[in-house]
Amino acid sequence: MHKKKIIFSDNTLWAIFNFRGNVIKHFTDKGYEVIVIAPEMEESEMQGSVPDGIRLIQVKMERAKTNPFSDIAYFFRVLRIYHKEKPVYIFHYTIKPNIYGSIAAKLNGVRSSAMMAGLGYAFKNDSLVSKIARGLYKIGMKCTENLFLLNKENLSDILRLKICNPKKITLLKGGEGVDLKHFGYTDNSSDDITFLFIGRILFEKGYNEFVECAKQIKKEYANVRFEILGTLDPTYPNSVSKERLEEDVQSGTICYAGFVKDVRPIYARKGIVVTLPSFYGEGLNRSLMEACATGKPIITTDIAGCRETVEDGINGYCIPPKDSNALIEAVRKYMNLTDEQRKKMSEASRMLAEKRFDIDNVIDIYDRII
């Protein structure tokens, strides 16, 4: 007897397993054959990326560029894949799978869901490209059964722009969730403090504000460092250049730890404060949720997708976006806390994660849909 198939389609292989690994394992444990569709990549990039028992289908796709001919070709590729595989359900993530994958699923008579993990470039301005993208999104969302959103502001924007029928929308209040056993609480007490930026290295993630803060704080305190963990993304329009990053590292302002697949050893270090002064269109920031789960204090901005991870003055500080001075002041506040006050912040982060971000709550929603 053939197993029923479920497809997960995203624009990066890493995101599928990093954000939805527990959901995928849950369905394989239930006896489904799970197929993952992701863009073509080098063999060296794939090593260790795909767990045993998961089938990967690579598809040619321009992840970030807007090219109608390339996008049409991508649409027909996934249309053929869905026709051949005949899955019982498809989960789409990110803009191109959400649009073209949802249409392809509908044409094949396959039930599907889409997830918008933050509103990207298509919703930031009124350029012709953005208007076309929003129009395509409306078509795609007519073809899908469910649309997952991760915060209330995104929900308001989607309703205001009439992108999707409200009856189809599910708000995941705890984002995509965190495995609270995998990301366990660790003692954070230390006299030496590291303010850690985790994420794609984009100006919109608050890179300039982070660097400006580092320059000032390092003049005032000796036992402090500012570290960045993440990747450069040259495909993104507002990405920090390799040259700029190297310049800030060589000046001694920041340290760069590169990219790691497993961040737990980083979180296991003592004296970590996860600091993300983002003004990017977040869904619900994964790194901040993981930081909460491991008991790290948070400094982040009062924007959708970030503010949900911090209770100001309780487990960290919530500051205005695009405000280096506010970030500097928040860092000063943390540096001047007593050991006991820092410990209470760490404990409060873990409590917040247990209250809001448990992955089991998300898995229950996936189960109800299928």
PLM feature segments, named:
Residues 326, 333, 340-355, 365-368:
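A short, well-ordered alpha-helix in the C-terminal region of glycosyltransferases
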Residues 230, 239-259:
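Nucleotide-activated donor-binding/catalytic signature segment of Leloir-type glycosyltransferases, i.e.
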Residues 37-43, 198, 225-240:
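Glycosyltransferase donor-sugar binding loop
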Residues 274-275, 297-300:
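Short hydrophobic beta-strand element within catalytic cores of glycosyltransferases
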Residues 57, 138, 142-185:
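Donor nucleotide-sugar binding/catalytic pocket of nucleotide-sugar-dependent glycosyltransferases
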